[in-house]
């Protein structure tokens, strides 16, 4: 997919449970490189987000992408850009076109198939692109890694494996619907998803990325020794 002169720009779409934890560590991979990153999310930090996402009390009321990019830019000598609006096809495609010197790496950390359809549409429009799409429930998840070089696609997109739900884009969801959504997730699951995505980003930078699907189970590598008595 790449050679030693490839420059990547990582677009983290959705900086909630998984995306905010990924964004916290992704800058460390970019230190000393010419790669760039951008956070995209139209959501606002709420006090309930502090427990499971990468935000602190001083961030409450701020846009999530803005709050995280502000932290990253203060901690690391890289430029983390942000877009404080929910992702649309037109907005994401325009952002990518503005940085044509970079191969876009679209990282989907969203919780709705309506946005996934947008991300796949952008992927299909581009000739050179990497798409890392994550999804998880309370205890497990999966990551689809699909690439395209000179218009040739490697591995399947999520929608090519199963039918998407006809859910709503965040822009079309009312405040009441958002409050009633009740999408239960856990910090440990989100953290494991974020680390798994980070591994794929590292593999990409090291020119070792493999396309396909990764299944992530938060209990897979947890071992219990019942012989010990407290």
Question: Residue locations for each model-derived region?
Answer:
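Short amphipathic alpha-helix with an adjacent loop that forms part of the alpha/beta core around
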Residues: 90-101
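Glycine-rich phosphate-binding loop and adjoining beta1-alpha1-beta2 segment
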Residues: 36-77
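Conserved acidic residues
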Residues: 84-88
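Glycine-rich phosphate/adenylate-binding loop
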Residues: 2-9, 16, 101-105, 109-230
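Glycine-rich adenosine-cofactor-binding loop
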Residues: 6-30, 38-46
């Amino acid at each position: 997919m790449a050679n030693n002169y490839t420059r990547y720009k990582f677009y983290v779409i959705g900086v909630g449970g998984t995306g905010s934890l990924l964004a916290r560590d992704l800058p460390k991979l970019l230190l000393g490189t010419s790669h760039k990153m951008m956070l995209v999310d139209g959501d606002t930090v709420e006090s309930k987000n502090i427990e499971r996402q990468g935000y602190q009390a001083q961030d409450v009321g701020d846009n999530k992408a803005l709050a995280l990019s502000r932290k990253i830019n203060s901690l690391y000598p890289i430029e983390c850009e942000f877009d404080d609006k929910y992702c649309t096809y037109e907005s994401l495609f325009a952002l990518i076109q503005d940085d044509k010197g970079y191969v876009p790496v679209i990282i989907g950390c969203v919780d709705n198939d309506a946005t996934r359809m947008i991300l796949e549409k952008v992927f299909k429009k581009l000739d050179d692109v990497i798409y890392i799409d994550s999804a998880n429930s309370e205890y497990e998840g999966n990551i689809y890694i699909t690439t395209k070089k000179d218009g040739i696609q490697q591995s399947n997109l999520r929608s090519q494996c199963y039918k998407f739900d006809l859910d709503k884009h965040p822009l079309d969801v009312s405040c009441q619907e958002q409050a009633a959504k009740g999408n239960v997730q856990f910090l440990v699951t989100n953290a494991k998803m974020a680390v798994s995505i980070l591994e794929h980003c590292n593999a990409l930078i090291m020119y070792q990325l493999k396309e396909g699907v990764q299944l992530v189970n938060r209990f897979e590598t947890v071992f219990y020794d019942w012989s010990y008595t407290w």
